Amino acid sequence: VDLSELEWHARRTLCFTRCRRVTVDGPVLLGAAHWTAAFFGCEDVTVKNLAIFGYRENSDGIDLVNCTRAQVSRCYIRTGDDAVCIKAMEPPPAVGGRDILVEHCTVWNDKVRALGIAGESRGEIYNIIFRRCTVLHSLADWAAEVGALCVVLCDAGTVHDIVFEQIDVLDERANGINCMLF
């Protein structure tokens, strides 16, 4: 699906809100105008074999926002912003984000984060695993809270039990690992 003719910020490409048992398998998405695959308050999400080729600011790859029980695997993500990030934009009593596995993904990001917990952290985020992924390139130059592997807490939420294992970072232009609390 070629979205490159859309104006910047025209719309999100794939957007799921408060859905259960969602599976996204195999699409190729090119030139998203805004967040490419966004899940808000979803449960039991599976994303696999997704290919994203983005270049614009705010063209996040996969954003799991206030989600529970999600798996992201075997995806290729090239973005002009975050590649795969967990976010908690709704405050409690909403679920912040929990029981999420991201594995066997290859990412390339410009501007912000390749893999991690993003600054939108208003709830409790926990039991998150990033493993066996490759960061081909990370040019994190937009702000201080950037890097290839990030945990950023800048709202009233909490973050615990976050694991990064067997992650290969081949080219990082700012911060390889960045953990910020503010």
Regions found by a protein language model. Give the residues of each.
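Extracellular/periplasmic carbohydrate-active domains that bind, remodel
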Residues: V1-F182
